[in-house]
């Protein structure tokens, strides 16, 4: 199936009433999640995973994907109007977006953020169409050694690009791999780490772990922190940027698109890094860098375009290789696996309706978001006034009901609560949960690839060095580890000398 016939079939799928509805629901929830500070797309997707069990694979993926890129749109609203980022990737939008609002230019700020997001998101969809297919053709030839090496590189990159301590992120990777080993050994059939609990024979469920780490812990953190939200009260008008605004913004939008898309493909990269790098780039090349932080529209246009382009780019390694580059894609991968579909090069051939349905839904979703965001600014502002003491307990109740409804099993509710408390403690001690989740989902594939490789080579580890792709990826992973150790040593050199 060529690209254009595939896209046409995708539009036929997405315009089916049920899929159109789930596309709309996904982007609406995503926008809502982006607008409300403190929840985020990861927590929302984790909480909504149980609702996808009764859906077809294409409907569930359309909805979850809509939540992801919808949250990138919605995050700019609170950054501009409240000076609180609704989504982590919109942090830098606060710097100039809120200043524009204070100057009476909230409308153009919101407008350019929406149009930039549309352009960046649309370009990234073209990128998925034209890159995923040839990459999948190459990946079909991958064997267990190549997949083992790629997963190693993915996990090392998630540590290397983490925002906190590299050592803490490495501990999270190891913890995720250990948790993924709970249950029945796929080769010997013996149980591991179940401690006599029959429920754990099939392993720890993805949904209670995700809901606990990203849903319950988020509720606990937000109940503890009282965010002072000074709502922008002036009337938002003139949402369409004028000609001067477009002249200033067109360059940042183009640069943000071409910067954000490849950063989204990189494991451990994504929308947050893309938005920060875009802002830094625009400030560095500006003739008047002192304007940044004082209401420069370029500081809104570039980052908002970049984070949406990165969001689209992150679908490529998941759909073409079966390797999630970040925790949100890991949750999408989990949703596919739950529906009996293994992401990767064969998925595009075996389930073309899923691949092309999602691609077409992203085109439709980006248009819906533009039409949804700008006219409903007043509604989003009213939602910002809902107190957290009302909102967060409702989210917690939703988590409890969702976890129990999976298998009508109280044990899974207990698992969710345990991981919720663990996630809260981890965040208090500045441990990132994202590397843990990536390792937890990739762990079984990583282990199977490792063991299959050794069976193929009669137990010889040299098989990983005999395959060119495996050798290159392992060499890159090794270089990243060495570089991390050197950076850590230089950073703490004085402390080592004095001790």
Descriptions of predicted regions:
Residues 27-41, 71-83, 158-163, 258-267, ...:
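Transmembrane alpha-helix interface/packing and boundary motifs in multi-pass membrane proteins
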Residues 69-74, 115-127, 135, 179, ...:
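Membrane-embedded alpha-helical segments of transport systems
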Residues 111-228, 338-493:
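Membrane-embedded alpha-helical modules
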Residues 68-80, 86, 296-321, 325, ...:
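A structural-propensity feature for long, helix-poor, extended segments
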């Amino acid at each position: 199936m060529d690209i254009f016939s595939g896209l046409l079939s995708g539009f036929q799928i997405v315009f089916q009433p049920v899929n159109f509805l789930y596309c709309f629901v996904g982007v609406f929830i995503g926008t809502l999640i982006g607008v409300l500070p403190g929840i985020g797309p990861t927590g929302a997707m984790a909480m909504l995973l149980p609702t996808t069990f009764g859906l077809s694979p294409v409907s569930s993926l359309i909805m979850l994907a809509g939540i992801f890129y919808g949250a990138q749109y919605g995050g700019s609203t609170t950054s501009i109007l409240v000076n609180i980022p609704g989504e982590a990737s919109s942090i830098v939008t606060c710097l100039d977006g809120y200043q524009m609002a204070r100057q009476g230019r909230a409308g153009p700020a919101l407008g350019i953020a929406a149009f930039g997001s549309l352009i960046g998101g649309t370009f990234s969809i073209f990128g998925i169409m034209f890159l995923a297919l040839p990459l999948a053709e190459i990946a079909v030839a991958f064997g267990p050694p190549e997949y083992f090496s790629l997963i190693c590189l993915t996990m090392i990159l998630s540590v290397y690009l983490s925002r906190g301590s590299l050592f803490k992120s490495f501990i999270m990777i190891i913890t995720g791999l250990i948790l993924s080993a709970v249950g029945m050994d796929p080769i010997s059939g013996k149980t591991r780490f179940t401690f006599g609990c029959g429920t754990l024979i099939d392993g720890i469920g993805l949904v209670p772990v995700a809901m606990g780490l990203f849903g319950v812990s988020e509720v606990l953190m937000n109940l503890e922190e009282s965010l002072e939200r000074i709502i922008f009260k002036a009337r938002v008008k003139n949402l369409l940027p004028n000609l001067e605004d477009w002249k200033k913004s067109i360059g940042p939008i183009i640069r943000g698109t071409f910067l954000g898309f490849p950063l989204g493909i990189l494991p451990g990269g994504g929308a947050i890094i893309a938005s920060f790098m875009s802002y830094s780039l625009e400030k560095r090349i500006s003739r008047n860098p002192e304007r940044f932080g004082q209401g420069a529209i370029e500081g809104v246009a570039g980052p908002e375009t970049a984070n949406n382009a990165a969001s689209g780019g992150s679908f490529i390694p998941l759909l073409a290789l079966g390797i999630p580059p970040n925790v949100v894609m890991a949750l999408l991968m989990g949703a596919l696996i739950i529906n009996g579909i293994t992401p990767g090069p064969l998925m595009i051939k075996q389930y073309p309706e899923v691949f092309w349905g999602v691609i077409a839904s992203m085109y439709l979703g980006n248009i819906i978001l533009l039409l949804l965001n700008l006219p409903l600014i007043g509604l989003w502002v009213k939602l910002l006034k809902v107190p957290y003491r009302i909102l967060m307990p409702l989210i917690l109740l939703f988590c409890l009901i969702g976890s129990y409804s999976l298998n009508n099993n109280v044990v899974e509710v207990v698992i969710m609560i345990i991981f919720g408390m663990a996630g809260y403690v981890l965040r208090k001690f500045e441990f990132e949960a994202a590397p843990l989740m990536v390792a937890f989902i990739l762990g079984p594939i990583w282990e199977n690839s490792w063991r299959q490789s050794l069976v193929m080579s009669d137990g010889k580890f040299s098989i990983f060095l005999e395959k060119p792709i495996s050798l290159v990826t392992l060499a890159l992973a090794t270089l990243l580890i060495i570089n991390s150790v050197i950076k850590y040593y230089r950073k703490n050199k004085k402390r080592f000398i004095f001790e």
